[in-house]
Design a protein with these regions (language model features):
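A short alpha-helical cap/connector motif
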Residues: 1-156, 160-239
Length: 239
């Protein structure tokens, strides 16, 4: 895998420097398949993506990275924050188009209204049978996963962006990860993270201050920060 360390951003760069999509995995060509290529053409670097009639808050680099990571993920995928189901649709479509279409996306969303809206989009796209919807607080669902030793090879975090919520997630995420898993944080590269008066955003600082040593920086793309899970750095790792 490519670590793309040259694309990392400093706190001063947040919301000022957006890196385009760069591949994490090795493959022939610029994109993994025709759907990935079409996604690249769906918006410019400054425009939010719409995918199959679903809108949201993804830049094209975010969407391309999600598709690539899900396409090559070897196990199930966890999404924390469904909203209207845009990123969920990208993840599940990538899985359907991959060589491992039996994998599942578990998506967590506290708003039942948002879950139903997302579910209707996914039914229309015929990807709903690859998605488990969890309409509960993320803390409850993650506790259940921990108790059952559920593991994921890819996690996309796009829920509560506050410092406290991100810290809480970082404290519980290692137990959910397979060795070599990737964790993608949305709104990691966002200028609102530097505004001390904006208590709704603190993703970057929370990761800088409290990410476990096992989460290694692996690049930034659009608004997203990517991290690789190195289980050798987790003294409490249980397979």
């Amino acid at each position: 895998m490519n670590n793309n360390l040259a694309s990392l951003v400093s706190r001063e760069d947040l919301g000022q420097l957006y890196h385009p999509f760069q591949p994490t995995y090795g493959y022939a060509g610029e994109y993994v398949d025709a759907t990935h290529a079409a996604l690249a053409e769906s918006a410019d670097q400054q425009t939010l993506v719409e995918f199959q009639g679903i809108d949201g808050f993804l830049r094209v680099a975010d969407a391309l990275k999600l598709y690539e990571l899900a396409f090559f993920a070897t196990g199930d995928v966890l999404e924390i924050g469904t909203h209207h189901g845009l990123s969920t649709a990208i993840l599940s479509t990538a899985i359907r188009n991959s060589q491992h279409p039996d994998r599942m996306v578990h998506t967590i969303e506290i708003s039942p209204t948002s879950v139903e809206r997302a579910r209707s989009h996914h039914k229309r796209l015929n990807v709903g049978d690859t998605i488990y919807y969890h309409a509960q607080p993320s803390t409850s669902v993650l506790s259940e996963f921990s108790a059952t030793r559920q593991k994921f090879s890819l996690v996309f975090v796009d829920h509560d962006h506050s410092y406290a919520a991100t810290i809480e997630l970082l404290d519980s995420i290692e137990v959910l990860l397979e060795p070599g898993s990737l964790v993608l944080f949305h709104d990691y590269n966002d200028s609102r993270n530097t505004n001390s008066d904006d208590l709704e955003y603190g993703v970057f600082d929370a990761i800088e201050h409290s990410a476990p040593p096992s989460l290694k920086p692996f690049g930034t793309f659009g608004c997203c920060g990517l991290f690789l899970y190195d289980s050798s750095e987790n003294k409490n790792y249980l397979s």
